[in-house]
């Protein structure tokens, strides 16, 4: 595992706070539970209230470590409303997990309806960066911005793909990677850490039952990797095992 752990001051987990965006299910929900279990204060968002299930149930069982908020990151007004609500808070980590896959990833791009492709690109690439820009000043000076991406967005690794599937999803994640690098260029002198994180092929609604990585393994790997880079002030593209990935 790659690591940049140095002699940086260690802040007790109990004093750390994370804004976790897109935590209603799957990886986002798993991360909310993991950070809370490690003693963090978690502000976790979902598009719609989950009632007594999902994130709401996790919050109820977390002894005050998880607080829920509503936001649709595709809705600029909703993003601004949340930004106003949280304006007095400061976060050690902002982790944007929200994303979507193509309804049928076996289709090549020319068979995907325009409105479907636009939805994937907006939610996977455009909206995460717009959200990051709106909330970046709520990160503490040594804070970390993490965004969930995929190795499928790597231009280098595309040659290792077994087939041509997931074309729209791959392209949207490549766009996210590029926009995040541009974001880093704008903010590189501010000292914060910016991480793009690949969770592995995980058994979730998106990953399916054939995925080789279980949710707990991915989530704990993401947590450990993020903590090892937190406070470094660097930018990196990493997988859940801490390996640096090629762009």
Language-model region placement:
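Conserved Rossmann-fold cofactor-binding substructure of NAD(P)-dependent oxidoreductases
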Residues: 73-89
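Rossmann-fold cofactor-recognition segment
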Residues: 59-77
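C-terminal helical subdomain
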Residues: 189, 196-197, 208-247
